[in-house]
Amino acid sequence: MMLSRIADAMFWIGRYVERADQTARILGVSLQSITEDAPLDPVDSCAGVYGIFGVTDVPAEDLTVQRVLERLVTDRANPSSVAGALQAARENARGVREALSTEVWESLNTATLGMPRVVRPSRMHGAFQFAKDRCAMVNGLLDASMTRDEAWLFLRVGQLLERVDMLARNLQAHDLSDTSDAATVLLLRSCSAHEAYIRSYRGRVRVSGAIEFLLLDSIFPRSAAYCLSEIDEALETLAKLHGNSFDRLGTAEPGRRIVGRALASLRFRQLEDITEDFEDEMEQLQRVTGAVTRSLGTTYFHPAA
């Protein structure tokens, strides 16, 4: 049975690498629209960008693209920034070198140390591309070099939980009343889903179709339903490895119950029911990721003696 220290570290490596990648993707699209779309109010738009990442009560002097870059891209002390998330992933990897290949460690080092410490708006796209490319490389090496054992499962669960959380935050900040093609395309692009959506929904881009695709599609690897299904499968495997898949009443362990309820809530409801109180639904999805994380901590990372 795996040491809880390794399980915990692998889980957070998965989360932090995914966070760096998703933050770079969302900011790349959002900040480009602010700098290139003249009608947009940069102050309100920057406040909206902060809101995606849960940053509220932002001082007026921070409502500029430059300050967004400083706080959400290059601040290594902030684990929610691109550089900070990579730094946190590297620190977790340092403690479990025995569970990672040399290639993964070197790639994560390169990603962390190579992130620029200062990014100007005129050069931000290069920084975002660097982060996305390096995260893709780290994930590719993890996928190609890791045995599908417990370490892999914890890494995978962390990655997928972060993906669901970031998707929910992004969708929560989206104005559903803006049904323009431009706004919907920006949403899909920020979720790396535009091309996949076009291949699946031939014809005009519609906001209802985009929400449906991002939440409910069963084969798109960035949809909420797909990620939750994969998390459930991984948690089932982990439970079996630890001999506690179900108790005598047929009840799954707490993390699986939380995921199962969330998945059923998506699968067995009409889209109109979900979008009726959309902000609250996305808030609930974020609470699910937090509850599963706490459950994993209690069950695997910091179990009671």
Predicted regions and their residues:
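Alpha-helical transmembrane segments and their helix-helix packing motifs
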Residues: M1-A305
